[in-house]
A protein has these predicted regions:
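Membrane-helix interface and helix-disruption motif detector
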Residues: 32-53, 71-76, 89-110, 128-129, ...
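Hydrophobic cores of alpha-helical transmembrane segments in multi-pass inner/ER membrane proteins
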Residues: 53-64, 110-121, 167-180
Length: 193
């Protein structure tokens, strides 16, 4: 039976989450950089976003699964991560498509981060941590997304988009790693037993 001591450290969770999800985002953004027009034509815009969401879930669950101990180990972690990332993607795309531009992006990041936090908190049965999880995810998401967008603007083209993915994935992955760490540590506190 796993215990508090078997949960990966916060440092390991930040580093493994950041680096692992950075590689995931690099792969996903590479398909955007090289195949966006083709995917839009074959799958429609909404189908392309669904494809990218599925790719994030497939690769992200694999990259982040080692940070979870106990009952949420692979493949069960895929279900939790899949629901969390799908909720995030749904919130982000709904607001982005409704509002467009900067307002759609930042409100999408906010709502998506809140939805992801709710799913993780519910999955680990630490509902009191929703606000902390949402704040962690939103701040890191904001930094990674907009700093990555700035890098994309500076470099442009395929390289810019791929670097955007690296920056975005590094920050969001580190935040997800932190959330997974705190969620598991919180589970072992007496009030959650």
């Amino acid at each position: 039976m796993p215990n508090h001591n078997s949960v990966p450290s916060l440092t390991r969770s930040l580093i493994a989450g950041g680096l692992g999800f950075s590689l995931v985002a690099l792969c996903v953004f590479a398909t955007v950089a090289t195949g966006e027009v083709w995917l839009y034509r074959k799958l429609t815009v909404y189908g392309a976003y669904l494809f990218w969401t599925a790719l994030f879930i497939l690769l992200g669950g694999l990259a982040l699964g080692s940070l979870v101990v106990g009952r949420w180990r692979l493949p069960k972690f895929y279900l939790l991560f899949g629901l969390a990332f799908f909720a995030y993607a749904f919130g982000w795309t709904a607001l982005y498509f409704a509002l467009r531009g900067f307002h759609g992006q930042w409100l999408g990041l906010l709502v998506g981060s809140i939805l992801m936090a709710i799913v993780f908190a519910a999955g680990f049965r630490v509902m009191r941590s929703i606000l902390k999880f949402a704040a962690l995810l939103f701040v890191a998401n904001w930094i990674g997304y907009f700093w990555g967008a700035d890098v994309n603007d500076r470099f442009g083209g395929t390289a810019g988009l791929m670097l955007w993915g690296v920056v975005y994935g590094l920050f969001l992955g580190a935040a997800i790693g932190a959330v997974l760490h705190y969620a598991q540590v919180q589970q072992w506190k007496p009030e959650n037993s």
